């Protein structure tokens, strides 16, 4: 993100972790098996050419498969802990509702929607609606239309009613119906 990110995503830890959380929601919200790479749930920011001590050796091409620093202290950083919590909740959603993530579930999405991407999953009366605002400018909120009814945001536990909703930049809603565990 530091190399290719634009605006605050390249410079702000908060924006980076929010963006990574949106990516995690989209990765873990799609059906099929998943792999989390090397402390990605904490926003790990050492590249593959880093030594076990954390020294970047990109220019040498060495250390690609060597041990990497384990950064459990990242859990003490609120922005990184928030990212970790998103991974936990999304994995909990997957583990408690495996039928939603199997080949026979109904799945639709707008991966190219900008700035708000959406995803819908359903199976056997269980329904999940995901809305993620990828806009990089923190002041850029978007109005979305939530399906009618009362939903629970799986990430926060808050109740959300259908209708218009203002989704701020860098945030997501993972709305579930009462059948979802």
Residue spans for each PLM region:
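C-terminal beta-strand-rich structural cap/linker in extracellular carbohydrate-active enzymes
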Residues: 161-181
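Aromatic- and carboxylate-lined catalytic core of secreted/periplasmic carbohydrate-active enzymes
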Residues: 66-112, 171
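Aromatic/acidic polysaccharide-binding cleft in carbohydrate-active enzymes
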Residues: 1-8, 28-78
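Solvent-exposed beta-hairpin/edge-strand motifs
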Residues: 145-157
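Conserved, mostly hydrophobic/aromatic
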Residues: 27, 39-41, 90, 129, ...
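Carbohydrate-binding surface patches
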Residues: 109-145
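Short, solvent-exposed loop/turn segments at secondary-structure junctions
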Residues: 41-45, 126, 134-137, 172, ...
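Alpha-amylase-like alpha-glycosidases and glucanotransferases acting on alpha-linked glucans and related
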Residues: 1-30, 102, 109-114, 122
